């Protein structure tokens, strides 16, 4: 038997039903907020992710890359490891005339995991707002994400906020190289005891500030003001990012959005330049995003600010209750026929489908338990409609009467 690749998943019919349900809720929310759907190719040039330094070396080690063979001049391409960078490239290539662009998409991303225990292909629902700076745009994205999760039936969604420049401002005093800053930050989050002991011994004031930022949590702008006061001179240039952060949470306060400030939740801040947010449902990380004002100019585009987020479909799918999808799932009708009535059966099925109801031809082996009704075409003027749940059969003489019953237009 040939097995599927390690780290890859098959999405079965029930999974895809949930997939489309989540996607439809997200898409409907985006459209009502003024976002327009786009789609980027699965293949992108590797240079899109390397020339601008938008991904860390650690992340680049996890991309699937290969040669796009074209004689001896082929370029190296990758299976996209990220959704935002291709969306930014799409804007630069096609939509620069738009002063403000609101874009949304569904995309799969690919990241190698040598253990095979983590998923190598992940589906994301993404939204980006390009050309708008400031806390109001950040709040719009956060509210859109929360609205989508609420419409999916999730209550008590946890919103965690961080700011990419806060940790960077402190780490810059320790290591000027940005890639090394990412590595050190990840080591600190992973609880690297040796690194923490070294920092405490060699740079005690810096270590104290890092602990202050990473261990304390708050739920208001006052918390951030206290951080500024407690960090003191050892905090480096924290004033500007803290003021930006305070402005952001002030907007959320006005909108009545609950949040937790968790400065240690900024892991993976490769191209982010401001506020970062993460979304959790029952402890499961289901989405996140932030501001990336330098990404578009880094990719060769205009100096446009931008921000965005992604919801993680693979993590949301198993969390959706089948009962939540009843409004989406249409009742299925089974179509049978007797004798030489195949054409009449097709006509009956098409009429039912025109009413927006699923109609399927019966074949031996079909499990009738999955259907609510069965229509048996006995002749052009003879039909039997069976309620498979109540086990009750009614006879009709024309198609219109059958349609009236199945569509609920009138009682039979």
From Swiss-Prot:
Keywords: Amino-acid biosynthesis, Cytoplasm, Histidine biosynthesis. It is found in: Cytoplasm. InterPro entries: aa-tRNA-synth_II, aa-tRNA-synth_II/BPL/LPL, HisRS-like_core, HisRS/HisZ, HisZ. The keyword Transmembrane helix does not apply. Pathway: Amino-acid biosynthesis; L-histidine biosynthesis; L-histidine from 5-phospho-alpha-D-ribose 1-diphosphate: step 1/9. SUPFAM superfamilies: Class II aaRS and biotin synthetases. One of its GO terms (cellular component) is cytoplasm. GO terms for biological process: histidyl-tRNA aminoacylation; L-histidine biosynthetic process. GO terms for molecular function: histidine-tRNA ligase activity. Required for the first step of histidine biosynthesis. May allow the feedback regulation of ATP phosphoribosyltransferase activity by histidine. Heteromultimer composed of HisG and HisZ subunits. This function is generally fulfilled by the C-terminal part of HisG, which is missing in some bacteria such as this one. HAMAP family: HisZ. Belongs to the class-II aminoacyl-tRNA synthetase family. HisZ subfamily. This is ATP phosphoribosyltransferase regulatory subunit. It comes from Dehalococcoides mccartyi (strain ATCC BAA-2266 / KCTC 15142 / 195).
